[in-house]
């Protein structure tokens, strides 16, 4: 915490000064926190004695700022009454919302960002700062001093939001005060401001374009090592589409219309972003931005910016090669169309493409390709879809290695070559970026392996569901078969007992024996032990895969090497600031050592990762191969179940048919006994019985004449009553389905229990 300047109190009522946030051309900015509410505000005090013109502009600027309400412009707040006395002069204080994540310069200064921000961060900057600039211009405000130091970051609902600060109202842009007003910020000023010409909103286009370029590549576009007075004379004759100028070893300036490598941008974004920069970095202020669009009345550069931000881009990581492919989606494009484009670029046939989201969910062919893009999420580093080749269970390569920047390749080959520290700073920055990139590549591939594992677990869940279904149906079939076999054996036994004196049917008996044999054959269908063993073995494999150390991230060594490279880079930056000439040159042996170790370590962890991934894919393929077997088994079980039920129903019908015959016979006997007549069949039956009776012992012979007739009538009446009762019960149960009926009455014990009634 820095000591407050003279006349400034650290405590103002309930407000306590915590630290100095920054210093500008006109004042200091301090952080104050309310001890009662914990609210934080940034307070800016004007520290210079200004002339009357600038005093008026300072005061007017504060009033204007209080009227601005936009997410991407810092919000002005009322100054607490307790702080009114801390002003260093008679000028009002400016209180603003406090943005806790620092400024854009702080983000760009991180060693891992020395070759540019991540694509998602670049797109977020384009969206936020572009929106803020347009809002200011719509309110007739030109910022004139856009630079990374004047873009602050605030976290809102878990998302980083960029906000424009220091709107520059107190800056007098006449030639005499230019140097005092813009100390340290001239690199971002539009060329016309150096020439004292009149200016328009296009000065903000130039500053914004310069910031975009630096965020993409890590350095400013035009001779970034030179002062503006030096580079403006060399750059003024650049081509209308040139967006970069560098000086070669011979001192010759070379221009380019493209963004340099290394950067972190996808191929799909690179070209439209270069087009945007070509509009914003035109030297001619009249041509800059390309005028207003006739339809939207927006500057053409912001129309193009909106088009870039509205692009739906699918980023695909090909796990067979480690290469990232980006595809710009057309409106309502289907997944089939996207897969055809993937096939053309990766040579993986459409039917063999397995597109997995981070959660392991497969892309749905019935849904549009936009399912591969998350709403509100931009950049290939934020969300990516993983592509697997279903025809392979082992990935052997070749894996696409990250491109080594030319300058880094030079120091790897010429390790001991002494180079100027200023040159080494740029080269080592690219080396740090390369090492960070190797670690990020591994992290993405590990996420791909994790997606494959989650997909395997989803398949395993389905396998378990199928297994449980198969087991349930198998047990049901076994139960029905046991009942059917027990029933038919009992029926055959009882049929044999009564066939000598009751009803007989050779056709029915043959059908019963055939059904018994078929039921015995179905017992084999119900046996699923072999499949159960395969499934249990697969479950064990998957558990072992989950327990494997290779199922967890193995990038610890790479993280340590990255930190070592960053530390070497920081040490080099410190040397660059030392005036001692003996520190003016150095070799790259230490940095090259870290590069080589990182590459070797990445090779090792990738070998382990792909070995583990191959096991995951093999287990998944085993599950896929099992599904048809299980489905066929389920079909066979269902067919057997249906057949057994049909056989049982057929036997039920036969029983009812027998019952019908028995009822008809008893009805006929009753009619004969009442009329005194007897059908020929019954007469024949009686004659046969009489013959049999004559051969029986005296104790078993049928009574004669009147006694016999009375006894027969009574017996028939008793049987008729019992049959009538049985038919009545059957009629009442007729509405119930056969399956819902209680079959226990068919068991032997039930029949024995009921036999007294018969």
From Swiss-Prot:
Regulation: Activated when phosphorylated and inactivated when dephosphorylated.
Enzyme Commission number(s) from the entry: 2.7.11.10
Domain of life: Eukaryota
SMART domains in the cross-refs: IKKbetaNEMObind, S_TKc
Subcellular location field: Cytoplasm; Nucleus
Chain intervals for the UniProt region annotation (Leucine-zipper): 456-477
Major localization class: cytoplasm
Keywords: ATP-binding, Cytoplasm, Kinase, Nucleotide-binding, Nucleus, Phosphoprotein, Serine/threonine-protein kinase, Transferase
CC terms in the record's Gene Ontology section: cytoplasm; IkappaB kinase complex; nucleus
Region described as NEMO-binding: 741-746
Any Pfam family hit: Pkinase
Signal peptide residue numbers: none
Active-site residues (renumbered): 145 (proton acceptor)
Domain called Protein kinase: residue spans: 15-301
Residue numbers binding ATP: 21-29, 44
Subunit text: Directly interacts with ikbkg/nemo.
Summary of the function given for this chain in its UniProt record: Phosphorylates inhibitors of NF-kappa-B thus leading to the dissociation of the inhibitor/NF-kappa-B complex and ultimately the degradation of the inhibitor. Phosphorylates 'Ser-10' of histone H3 at NF-kappa-B-regulated promoters during inflammatory responses triggered by cytokines.
Family designation: Belongs to the protein kinase superfamily. Ser/Thr protein kinase family. I-kappa-B kinase subfamily.
Protein name: Inhibitor of nuclear factor kappa-B kinase subunit alpha
Gene name of this polypeptide: chuk
């Amino acid at each position: 915490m820095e000591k407050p300047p003279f006349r400034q109190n650290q405590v103002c009522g309930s407000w306590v000064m915590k630290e100095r946030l920054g210093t500008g051309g006109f004042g200091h900015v301090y952080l104050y926190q309310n001890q009662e509410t914990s609210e934080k505000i940034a307070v800016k005090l004007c520290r210079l004695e200004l002339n009357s013109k600038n005093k008026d502009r300072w005061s007017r600027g504060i009033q204007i700022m209080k009227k601005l309400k936009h997410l991407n412009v810092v919000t002005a707040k009322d100054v607490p009454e307790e702080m009114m006395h801390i002003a260093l002069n008679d000028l009002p204080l400016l209180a603003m919302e406090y943005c806790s994540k620092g400024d854009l310069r702080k983000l760009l200064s991180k060693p891992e960002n020395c070759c540019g921000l991540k694509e998602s961060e670049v797109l977020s900057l384009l969206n936020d700062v572009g929106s803020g600039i347009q809002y200011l211009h719509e309110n007739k405000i030109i910022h004139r001093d856009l630079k990374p130091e004047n873009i602050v970051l605030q976290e809102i609902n878990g998302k980083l939001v960029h906000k424009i600060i220091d709107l520059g109202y107190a800056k007098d842009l006449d030639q005499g005060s230019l140097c005092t007003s813009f100390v340290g910020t001239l690199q971002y000023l539009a060329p016309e401001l150096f020439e004292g010409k009149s200016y328009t909103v296009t000065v903000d286009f130039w500053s914004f374009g310069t910031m975009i370029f630096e965020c993409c590549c890590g350095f400013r576009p035009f001779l970034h090592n030179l002062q503006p007075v030096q580079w403006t004379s060399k750059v003024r004759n650049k081509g209308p589409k040139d967006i970069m100028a560098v000086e070669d070893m011979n001192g010759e300036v070379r221009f380019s219309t493209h963004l340099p490598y290394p950067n972190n941008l996808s191929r799909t974004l690179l070209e439209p972003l270069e087009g945007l920069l070509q509009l914003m970095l035109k030297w001619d202020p009249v041509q800059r931005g390309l005028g207003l669009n006739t339809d939207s009345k927006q500057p053409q550069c912001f129309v193009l910016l909106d088009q870039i931000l509205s692009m739906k881009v699918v980023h695909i990581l090909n796990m067979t090669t480690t290469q990232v492919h980006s595809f710009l989606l057309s409106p309502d494009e289907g997944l089939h169309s996207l897969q055809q484009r993937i096939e053309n670029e990766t040579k993986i046939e459409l039917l063999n493409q397995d597109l997995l989201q981070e959660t392991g969910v497969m892309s749905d062919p019935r849904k549009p390709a936009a399912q591969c893009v998350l709403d509100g999420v931009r950049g290939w580093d934020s969300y990516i879809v993983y592509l697997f080749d279903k025809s392979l269970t082992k990935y052997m390569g070749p894996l696409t290695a990250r491109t080594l920047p030319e300058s880094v390749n030079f120091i790897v080959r010429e390790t001991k070559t002494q180079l100027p520290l200023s040159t080494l700073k740029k080269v080592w920055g690219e080396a740090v970026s390369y090492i960070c990139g190797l670690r990020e590549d591994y992290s993405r591939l590990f996420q791909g392996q994790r997606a494959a594992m989650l997909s395997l677990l989803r398949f395993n869940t389905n396998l378990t569901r199928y297994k449980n279904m198969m087991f349930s149906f198998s047990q049901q079939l076994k139960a029905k078969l046991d009942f059917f076999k027990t029933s038919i054996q009992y029926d055959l036994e009882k049929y044999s007992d009564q066939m000598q004196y009751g009803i007989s049917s050779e056709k029915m008996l043959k059908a019963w024996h055939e059904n018994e044999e078929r039921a015995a054959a179905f017992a084999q269908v119900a046996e699923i032990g072999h499949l159960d063993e395969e499934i249990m073995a697969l479950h064990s494999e998957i558990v072992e895969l989950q327990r494997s150390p290779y199922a967890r991230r193995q990038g610890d060594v790479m993280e340590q090497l990255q930190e070592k490279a960053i530390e070497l880079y920081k040490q080099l930056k410190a040397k660059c600031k030392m005036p001692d000439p003996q520190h003016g040159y150095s070799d790259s042996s230490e940095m090259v050592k870290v590069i080589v170790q990182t590459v070797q370590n990445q090779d090792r962890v990738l070998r382990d990762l792909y070995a583990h991934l191959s096991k995951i894919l093999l287990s998944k393929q085993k599950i896929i191969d099992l599904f048809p077997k299980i489905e066929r088994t389920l079909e066979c079980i269902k067919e057997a179940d249906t057949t057994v039920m049909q056989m049982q129903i057929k036997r039920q019908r036969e029983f009812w048919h027998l019952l019908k015959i028995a009822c008809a016979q008893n009805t006929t006997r009753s009619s004969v006994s009442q009329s005194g007549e007897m059908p020929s069949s019954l007469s024949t039956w009686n004659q046969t019985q009489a013959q049999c009776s004559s051969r029986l012992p005296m104790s078993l012979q049928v009574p004669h004449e009147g006694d016999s007739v009375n006894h027969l009538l009574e017996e028939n009446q008793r049987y008729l009553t019992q049959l009538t009762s049985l038919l009545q019960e059957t009629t009442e149960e007729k509405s119930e389905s056969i399956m819902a009926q209680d079959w226990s009455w068919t068991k032997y014990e039930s029949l024995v229990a009921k036999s007294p009634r018969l």
